[in-house]
């Protein structure tokens, strides 16, 4: 029997929900109330994100189920010297029931970071920038405690009711500025951006005692992501002993140069070399598309200077709808002769 069901209600799931049901509930609720949507509600979105952050952590979920939201926020209940009830029992006497130690106040930025990591850094709906969400425009949260008053519950020195020995007020945590964001360029091939490949690699970072350590980072690329797309991982960089937190890592997609294709938005450009003869009499060739298929190209008429041919649906996937693709644009590069002999000149003169 859980103490309260508020967080489960925010995600639209039952207290017995498993991990997949929690993720499904968060996805539906977060998309509905995201501030960029017409149905958006910033405060509701923050509550939904905090609910998922707590319930998706087995330890925090256990604390929430047993003691409630404030306990989950602060990491668990604390008791006086006499334990629960203490030597003098509960209810305003020495050694009575303890309160909760203070924890990090869940902020708007925390909400957007959770959303970004859940969806891999890209926008899951139209109207947002292809490079993902920018969190710098959203203010950080952080209230003084329940009721907005210093000292937490009741806002009075003695806790609830202001009586010594009763419930102690929530202790306030020191407020630190947001951890530094370290950007790391991530070179990716067009083929990997086409299919949306998973990239896994190990990074070195400083641990709590200054020693070097390694951790694995997994990035699930989304089909059609472009250069400049940012994927943010909070609390994954070097450890900061002053705050007890880690720096934020932000990976920036960089497109590797391709031997055959040049990208222009969702379109791919292929330059096809032609001899002077082929440019006049026509040609029949094949090229390999970005997804490995063979595409036949042919013409029976002369190729005009700066002429191109467009093949719809043969380019890169569009990030907002990967089932749709841009175009393949073929440009022709004619190898014009540097010089002509007399016979060639006569042939041109007699026929043109």
Curated annotation (Swiss-Prot):
Modified residues (Phosphoserine): 275
Record's GO cellular component terms: cytosol; cytosolic small ribosomal subunit; nucleolus; nucleus
MF terms (GO), sorted A to Z: DNA binding; misfolded protein binding; protein-folding chaperone binding; unfolded protein binding
Superkingdom of the organism of origin: Eukaryota
Stretches with biased composition (Polar residues): 301-312
Classification via Pfam families: DnaJ, DnaJ_C
CDD domains per record: DnaJ (cd06257), DnaJ_C (cd10747)
Domain J: 4-70
Compartments where found: Cytoplasm; Nucleus
Transmembrane segments: none
Listed GO biological process terms: cellular response to heat; cellular response to starvation; chaperone cofactor-dependent protein refolding; detection of misfolded protein; misfolded protein transport; mitochondria-associated ubiquitin-dependent protein catabolic process; nuclear protein quality control by the ubiquitin-proteasome system; protein folding
Keywords, comma-separated and alphabetical: Cell cycle, Chaperone, Cytoplasm, DNA-binding, Nucleus, Phosphoprotein
Region (Disordered): 300-325
Subunit text: Interacts with polyadenylate-binding protein PAB1.
The protein's role, per its UniProt record: Required for nuclear migration during mitosis. It is required for the normal initiation of translation. Might mediate the dissociation of a specific protein complex of the translation machinery. Essential for viability.
Misc: Present with 20300 molecules/cell in log phase SD medium.
Name of the featured protein: Protein SIS1
Taxonomic source organism: Saccharomyces cerevisiae (strain ATCC 204508 / S288c)
Gene field: SIS1
